Structure formats: structure tokens, C-alpha cells
Amino acid sequence: LKNDDAKGALYELVEEADIFIQNFRPGTAERLDVDYDTLTDHNEDLIYLAISAFGQTGPWRERSGYDLLIQGMSGIMSVTGEADRQPVKVGLPMTDLITAMWAAFGATTALYRRERTGEGEYIDLGMLEATLPWLTKQAGMVFAGEETKRMGTKDPVLAPYQTFETKDGFINICILNEKLWGELCEALDRPDLPEDDRFEQNADRVEHLDELEAEIEATLADKTTDEWIEVIAEDAGVPAGPVYSVEEALNSPQIEARGTVTEIEHPELGEVPVIEHPLKFRNAESGFELPPPLLGEHNREVFRERGYSEAEIDRLAELGVFGDDAEDGDTDD
């Protein structure tokens, strides 16, 4: 984008575009002449989405940011991990994914609004602000004047709602009300637990979490995870499940039955396993029609659609408009 020919080509693409997304630090788009005001000179109905670590305003606006930083600065790490250990990062790029979902939601909402009003839109999305709404329970505690802290897999307001150790592994048990608590105790053959003053009501159990955990794990140690799943989840109908590895999750019978993992044909890698689109529409097709494109695979196709000749596309490629490492696309058709 420091090349005038590249900018000219981009402006022509923008003329027919619905949505333009950039994730530069604030100020960079202006320096490159791809800011909202510049691009809307070429398409006044454009939906422009600017993603950054901390948004376009505020004292941190010019800072760079990545998932680890945002997990720390959003408070996620302060409530993740065991109480007596250091803060822990969630084991996936959570804030990247959260921000991407907000971006998709914002862009499609703006597109729908444009269909009704004819107006384009400028959307300012910061990773930190995108993440905070997901801390619903913890934010509510802060607003109520309560302290948030790391609790491992325990829940600050529900008990038992955590991971327990079994004879050969781990099991998650989720008790949301007194009915389920009674059914769990019956499944565990522990009628004494509901009669114990420490465990009678949810508030009592939250107050005595450590003692509750010790009592339940003493019983769970007698059987394997699979055995307890049958007793607790299948027979008693109490919410409970195993702690799978990623491989076990991808190969579970439920995922197999839903056709969630499938294969696509990649032009260089052959058959490649992928996780399918999770939204299963009744009246519309969803899922993968094509494999992910190679870098620059559709350059020529896109510029042909804009009326460029092969000679003009060749010239852009020679000038480096498509990038040093990108293919310039198929020249056979």
C-alpha cells in the first residue's frame, strides 16, 4: 500500500466492495491513505471495520496488542487457574476469537442496516472491549462489590459445579439447583450429604467448597470416569461429562454422528480434515464448498472482474502490487 499503483488498484476494488476490514494500529490507515474518509470518497456506502487492540481512542490507542496481553488486561487471567498458583492463560487464543466473532456480527449487522437505510457505516472495534462483555459473572460480582479470584474449575456462585477426580481420570459435574443436587447425591449413594448443614443449600455448599469437594471425590474414587458417566449422566440424568483430550473430542461418537469433522480436497495437500460450520441451516446450504485459497490464488480472477486486461494485471504483478510472496493467480483461463 506504499505503492501508488497498489493504492489505485485497491480504490477500484473498494468501489464495488460492501465491507472493508483492517487491523492496523490507529493512525496507520491514515498514513497509508486507506482510512474511512479516503475510501468513502470512492464508495460512500462502504461499511468500514477498524480492528485494533484498544480501539481508536483512549490513552492506550497506539499500543499493539495480542491475545496474551488482552487476556491479562481484561481480567481473564486473574480468574483462571488455581487459587494458590500464578495466573493462567486460557489454552486457546480466546480474545482473538472473541474479537473475530464481534467483527463478523458487527459487519453483518451493518450490512443488514444498510439494506434498510442505504447508509454505510464506520465500526471501531477494540480487542479489550470485545472481551470484557464475556466476563458477565465476574463483572457482575465486581459491580456488586464482591471480590473475584482464581478458583480452578470451581464456580463462585454454584456448587458443585467443577471438575472432580475419579478412579482413572476426571469428570465434570454441573449442579444448578437443589433438585439436581438431590439427584446427584442419590446417584452417588450419599444420602448423608443433603442432610449435612454444610451442604444443604447452594449458598452453604459454596461456603464450604473444599469440604464438599473432599466428600464427593472420596466417593468418585471408587469408579472410573466412564462408570460414573453411566451412573450420573445416563441413569440419573444429572449434567456430567468427561474431560476429553482434543483428539478424543474430535473422535467422539456425538461429533461423528453430527458429521462435524469432514474432509475437503486441497490443491496441494490432497484430502485435508476440517471442522465443519457449526450452524446447520434447514433451508440453506452451509459448510465448505471450496478449500482455503492459496496466497494470491484469485488475484487475476478478481482483477479480471474489475475489467483489467492480462497485460495490466501482469504490470501490477511486476510492480509488486500483489506482494512479494504471493502468487499472481492462474493465467490459464
Outline where the language-model segments fall:
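A structured beta-alpha segment of the ubiquitous adenosine-cofactor-binding alpha/beta core
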Residues: 1-41, 221
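Flexible, small-/acidic-enriched active-site or ligand-binding loops
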Residues: 269-315
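A glycine-rich dinucleotide-binding beta-alpha-beta segment and adjacent secondary-structure elements
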Residues: 234-289
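Aromatic-enriched alpha-helical interface/lid elements that frame and gate functional surfaces
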Residues: 159-236, 240, 253
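Amphipathic terminal alpha-helices
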Residues: 311-333
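Beta-strand segments within the central parallel beta-sheet cores of soluble alpha/beta enzyme folds
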Residues: 12, 120-128, 197, 231, ...
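Active-site-adjacent "lid/gating" segments in soluble enzymes
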Residues: 30-171, 175-176
